[in-house]
């Protein structure tokens, strides 16, 4: 989740 935590915020 490096720079993609907003997409893996489920």
From Swiss-Prot:
It comes from the Eukaryota. This is Unknown protein 12. The lineage of its organism: Eukaryota, Viridiplantae, Streptophyta, Embryophyta, Tracheophyta.
């Amino acid at each position: 989740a490096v720079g993609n935590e907003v997409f893996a915020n489920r």
